[in-house]
């Protein structure tokens, strides 16, 4: 149950932090939010939550969006809700459809979900540009890749017979 509460809190918390964190100007004048670095972990937490509670994770996503609607600007809440609807549902579908090991499902679902989420979110908040997209997607995937690697190593160690 704690994983669902963590997922809900992350959705609402990320939106609140996004709203109060100043944007960084990138070369060429594009804007980027440092919060993007931690957003990738939300995709991974969703994967852990889905592994634990199945499709109920979608209800947790709706709860996080509802809290965001009450705590941040309506523009940000709408952009976040739309991005979550597209990115997280794609992430959920890939995670559900593949019968691959957990680490691979984390990687595959993030590779699809992060770009979709970024495209929708940045477009709706008026910050979409090629550089901003690249930086946001890279930031999100960085967190997902770190967790993928850690889970993959654990799976690999667990597959090695003791005494070998």
Labelled PLM ranges:
Residues 24, 45, 55, 63, ...:
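Hydrophobic alpha-helical membrane-insertion segments
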Residues 77-163:
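Membrane-embedded alpha-helical hairpins and interfacial helices in multi-pass inner-membrane proteins
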Residues 56-88:
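Helix-adjacent hinge/juxtasegments
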